[in-house]
């Protein structure tokens, strides 16, 4: 599938840097907002491990199904009566189905008939809006990617860019004739007001952009909008390796630090199965001090380790041509793997700077788990030992294992998928009701 979106607008490095330093202290604007009626179908993202009864039952079936009701009760530590009620409600909502063909031989009564997720009729739509590239993702109820298209993030005026995004998403959904879309999740940089779906994105020049309302109006579906690094941390919680309910219930509260680096840098903190999302938007690490003679930059982290910084340095060092089809980050990575000493040294220095920043965050927050995501880490895993060494040398705390994201180079699509599925996983019955009501009103 292909979707045509215009090439992204570029802001000057000086303007982007200046705006980035100030964006956290300035509240989102409130002028010229859409009518309140347009905000009724914006739902704050649910980036947490579900804990309500119906959500716990659905999670058990999603991760362990086909499964009998008594096994669900053991996994969730809910009473069999509660499980029976929730399974009946989930069957009525259409998100579960019975598998009579798998019933235990000789068993009598419907409660012994296994159930599984009824995933074929549905999908959710995820949109990851990056500084340069936008990904549109179709995800099933298991959290598996059905399809993804990547296109340049639209340029032009803010209103024109949003109209282009909405039109592309609508055309994309129109191709899914056998699956009904339930929800839209948007993962995007900048400062996000998750309650209204508005955001500021300095790199794109968006101010008080009604991303959520525009998509809700165009698609006729509930929409959730989240900071993209929060969404990536949410994907680790919702779509990563599951923990059983008894294990989770008996374990102490844990914290997880997620650090992201690609064209931008960011972090998110998960506390006891929930991504910490301040109402004023995520904090920024773009301005952390960073020094590299090879990479250059302004002495701040983002301008030193971004993809653009690596490309500029590689051109200056004549690792790649100044322009043309070979003047790409992929060419830098290829040169390093083919034994180009300058390329290896450049990427190692990027890994060192990133490791020192991770050490600073680790010492400040002291998380139980430390996860690295984004192509700065995943596209060059050869640099991970350098990151680990820099963390060990710079951190004043004891050793802590570091792991790469479970989603590798697919972290952008996973983040969008987690936002589109979070509401359904947290309240599957309510989500199905909301999606049906919104869809009916739009017809």
Model-found features: residue ranges?
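ATP-binding/phosphotransfer module of carbohydrate and carboxylate kinases, centering on a glycine-rich
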Residues: 2-102, 106-148, 154-166, 170-174, ...
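Phosphate-binding/catalytic loop of phosphoryl-transfer enzymes
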Residues: 127, 141, 183-187, 191-303, ...
């Amino acid at each position: 599938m292909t979707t045509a979106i215009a090439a992204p607008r570029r802001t000057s490095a000086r303007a982007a840097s200046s705006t980035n330093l100030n964006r956290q202290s300035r509240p989102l604007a409130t002028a010229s907002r859409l009518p309140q009626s347009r905000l009724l179908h914006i739902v704050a993202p649910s980036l947490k491990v579900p804990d309500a009864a119906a959500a716990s039952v659905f999670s058990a079936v999603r991760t362990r199904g086909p499964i009998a009701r008594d096994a669900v009760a053991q996994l969730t530590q809910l009473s069999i009566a509660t499980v029976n009620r929730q399974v009946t409600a989930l069957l009525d909502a259409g998100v579960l189905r019975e598998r009579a063909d798998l019933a235990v031989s000789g068993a009598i009564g419907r409660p012994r008939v296994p159930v599984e997720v009824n995933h074929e009729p549905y999908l959710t739509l995820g949109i990851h809006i990056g500084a340069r590239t936008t990904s549109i993702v179709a995800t099933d109820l298991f959290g598996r990617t059905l399809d993804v298209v990547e296109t340049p993030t639209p340029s032009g005026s803010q209103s024109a860019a949003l109209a282009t995004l909405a039109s592309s998403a609508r055309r994309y959904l129109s191709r899914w004739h056998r699956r009904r879309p339930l929800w839209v999740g948007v993962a995007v940089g900048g400062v996000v007001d998750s309650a209204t779906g508005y955001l500021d994105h300095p790199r794109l020049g968006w101010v008080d952009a009604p991303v959520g309302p525009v998509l809700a109006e165009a698609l006729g579906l509930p929409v959730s909008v989240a900071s993209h690094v929060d969404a990536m941390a949410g994907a680790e919680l919702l779509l990563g390796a599951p923990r059983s309910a008894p294990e989770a219930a008996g374990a102490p509260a844990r914290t997880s630090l997620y650090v992201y680096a690609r064209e931008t840098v960011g972090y998110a903190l998960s506390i006891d199965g929930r991504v910490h999302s301040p109402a004023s938007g995520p904090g920024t690490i773009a301005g952390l001090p960073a020094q590299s003679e090879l990479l250059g930059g302004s002495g701040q982290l983002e301008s030193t380790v971004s993809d653009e910084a690596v490309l500029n340095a590689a051109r200056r060092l004549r690792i790649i041509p100044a322009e043309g089809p070979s003047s790409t980050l992929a060419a830098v990575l290829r040169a390093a793997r083919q034994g180009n000493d300058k390329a290896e040294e450049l990427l190692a220095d990027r890994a060192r700077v990133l490791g020192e920043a991770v050490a600073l965050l680790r010492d400040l927050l002291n998380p139980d788990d430390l996860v690295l995501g984004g192509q700065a880490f995943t596209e060059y895993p050869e640099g991970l030992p350098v990151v680990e060494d820099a963390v060990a040398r710079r951190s004043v705390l004891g050793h802590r294992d570091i792991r790469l994201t479970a989603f590798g180079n697919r972290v952008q699509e996973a983040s969008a998928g987690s936002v589109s599925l979070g509401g359904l996983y947290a309240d599957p019955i309510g989500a199905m009701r909301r999606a049906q009501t919104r869809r009916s009103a739009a017809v």
